[in-house]
Amino acid sequence: MKALLYSGLLALALAACTTKPEAPKTDLYQEITASDARYDSSLATRLKADEYGMHQYVLAYLKSGPNRSQDSVEAAALQKAHLENIARMAESGKLVLAGPFLDEGEVRGIYIFDVPTVEEARALTETDPAIQAGRLIMELHPWYGSAALPLLTPLHNRLEKKSITN
């Protein structure tokens, strides 16, 4: 019995000695930027980047609207429909960023649209059930930002464990 115990311990000790140690984890920013990144004209063209790597978008501030008197059931239904509308616009590629502000101020959240005009962004915001119900209003502005923003949605999808629309 002792021989069996010693044999088992010896096998574990040998396995521990031969197992490769886990590689140290690198900082994600370093990992992403460590490559010999140079200007990529093909990527710049696909993302509609100008010579500075920038692109024009439309920024929308979602503000509290004049009609916030819905009961909790109706407010929850509007919020669900609002989130489903966000998902639909993101899937179309026209909405590249969306999110709420975490305070209780008048400005409730933002959208960044990848559309050429404020008018097109306005038409998209008018599809939102919360806008239609007057629970939210939009303030729209042309905005100039990184042309890489459309890459956020596919990257986010790799991080999202649970969907906001479920």
Where are these regions (language model features)?
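C-terminal motif of bacterial Sec signal peptides marking the signal peptidase cleavage site
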Residues: L14-A16
